Amino acid sequence: MSALRLRKVDALLAQATRALGAGRRLGFSSRGQHAELSLLPLLEDARIPADGVWLNTAVGPLLLSDAEALLSLLGEVPFTLGGEHQGWYWQLFNQRLSPVVADLLAPVAPFSDTPTELAIGCRVHVRLGSERLDTRLHAAPATLLRLLGSADWQVLNRNLDESWSVSTPLIVGELSLTREQIASLRPGDVVLPARCRFDSAGQGSVTLAGRQWAARTDQQAQHLFLQLSHEEHSHHEY
């Protein structure tokens, strides 16, 4: 059997992926309407889009696909990449960004260079009134971490699929037997464990995920329920 070889992952990339998690949501207002900006994990093709545009921001360079539509929803001045942009246009655009977005990204400015460091991608979803937009954002892991840490983002939680299950042995007791003793056992023999994990009332302990959990068993309608509790967590029933 060959040894399991795990893919090496850059430490900052792993940290940024964990920080993004199932996604983040940021509320803001634009054009007198409530809006939401969501960053979500990019589960499909994560390659950098050829039509993406690099822009410099307060948190670092960001590559945006469909940048004109995205940035136009984040403020009151339509964003365009056409023509020659003069300094006054960028100043006006940044001044008319939503205050929440401006605190996060401003000043937004052209970025002529293409970063050579590794980039991580995520989906971007914007909701403004009846308008919806889905696009993509790519950035260096350190930049994404600054982006996630520079505003009051709401952490999104993904509901666990009820069909997903984890199997783990439930050890109720332990006993050491020699090979000869095991060979001498016959059907109907009663074996008493030398160390019991549960008492006769169904109280005991379970080691799960590297932690020691207080456990209590309960039987209802021919089903055995196991209640686990930990001082850092609320009760969990299975």
From Swiss-Prot:
Keywords: Cell inner membrane, Cell membrane, Membrane, Virulence
Domain comment in the entry: The HrcQa-C domain interacts with the hrcQb C-terminal domain.
Designated gene of the protein: hrcQa
The protein's assembly and partners: Interacts with hrcQb.
Cellular component terms (Gene Ontology): plasma membrane
Purpose of the protein: Component of the type III secretion system, which is required for effector protein delivery, parasitism, and pathogenicity. Probably participates in the formation of a C-ring-like assembly along with hrcQb.
Presence of the UniProt keyword Cell inner membrane in the record: yes
Protein name: Type III secretion protein hrcQa
Subcellular location: Cell inner membrane
Predominant subcellular localization, coarse grouping: membrane
Superkingdom of origin: Bacteria
Membrane-topology annotation of the record: Peripheral membrane protein
Region (HrcQa-C): 66-238
